[in-house]
Swiss-Prot record:
Transmembrane segments: none annotated. Keywords: Centromere, Chromosome, DNA-binding, Nucleosome core, Nucleus, Ubl conjugation. This is Histone H3-like centromeric protein CSE4. GO terms for cellular component: 2-micrometer circle DNA; CENP-A containing nucleosome; kinetochore; nucleus; peroxisome. Component of centromeric nucleosomes, where DNA is wrapped around a histone octamer core. The octamer contains two molecules each of H2A, H2B, CSE4/CENPA and H4 assembled in one CSE4-H4 heterotetramer and two H2A-H2B heterodimers. Interacts with the inner kinetochore. It comes from Yarrowia lipolytica (strain CLIB 122 / E 150). It comes from the Eukaryota.
């Protein structure tokens, strides 16, 4: 059985469009001209970041800022709950000054930041970039009973 090859001027298959169909090479639609309406069926894709770029951007943002990262109301609820459990029900109607709660939150966040710095150093010492539970345990064990305070 012999095969017959038909040579034609178009190299595409009949019925299938050639090319990108009017799309930008990166998958974006072309810009609309003034007075021209955009076709709502075509989707404009956002530019994709390389893996790890968004994480690095987030790290830089948090290192630059000084704002509190834990929400204030949930933190205040936890503080009140711990105080109630520690002191007992006879002190059930304790009132807290907002500055006292703010000072506790500042101290708690500073403690956590310092702890995670130590945990990161433990992970780097183990030739890893990912922190693990064993890094947290080692950092807390090295810090001692008071967690590096005092």
């Amino acid at each position: 059985m012999a095969r017959i090859s038909l040579a034609s001027s178009s190299a595409g298959v009949a019925g299938k469009p050639r090319g990108g169909g009017g799309l930008h090479p990166l998958g974006q639609t072309r810009k609309t001209l003034p007075g021209e309406r955009r076709d709502t069926t075509q989707k404009i894709t956002k530019p994709r970041y390389k893996p790890g770029q968004k994480a690095l951007k987030e790290i830089r943002r948090y290192q630059r800022g000084t704002e509190l990262l834990i929400a204030k109301l949930p933190f205040a609820r936890v503080v009140r709950e711990v105080a109630l459990n520690y002191l007992g029900s006879e002190y059930g109607n304790l009132q807290w000054q907002s500055m006292a709660l703010l000072a506790l939150q500042e101290a708690a966040e500073a403690f956590l930041v310092h702890l995670f710095e130590d945990v990161n150093l433990c992970a780097i010492h183990a030739k890893r970039v990912t922190i693990m539970q064993k890094d947290m345990q080692l950092a807390r064990r090295i810090r001692g009973a008071w967690g590096g305070a005092g």
